[in-house]
Amino acid sequence: MNTLKAQRRETTEKAKKLRREGYVTGNLFGRQIEGSILLKIEKKEAERIMRECMKGSQIMLEVEGKEYDVLIKEMDYDAMTRSILEMDFQELVKGEKVHSVAEIILHNKDKVIEGALEQLLEEVAYKATPEHLVDKIDVDCSTLHLGDTITVGDLAIAKNKDVDVVTHLDSVVVTVLTPNNADIPSDEDAEETAAE
């Protein structure tokens, strides 16, 4: 399991100032934590963990020597630079279900040769205990043809008895559509070309 190191942040330390100094701010909360713990994380450390993890990933958070089994609950990015600004973590309790999301990753998109592949859903919301958390869902697009659709109900996560899927099972994840109508000459266009 990936480990992220963080430090406690004093309430007097302003987020903007910390970000200028190379930190990402954060919060740790959970049923067994009174209030929440304000955090500061070295930006390089946050970027390292984000290369391997995502929203919904389970990691070990080390705060000044104490380790917490946590879920990456939220991440805020700078709209212009897309650099990470803030991360929120929820402490996990063994045997207790937690709300989370699993990111949908499409594979073999280039194998879809007829039609245009359109992804309509980026993540699936679900509830599970810490030992059954899912941070990503891999979807193979290599066998999709024009008119094919994959719904949440078709995904492995929907068939996992240890996971309660919250997103509607009939929600469309990906579909293969007819290519843009502008690229296909209509009968009227053909008639106009012939008349010229």
Predicted features along the sequence, with ranges:
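Acidic, negatively charged sequence tracts
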Residues: 1-196
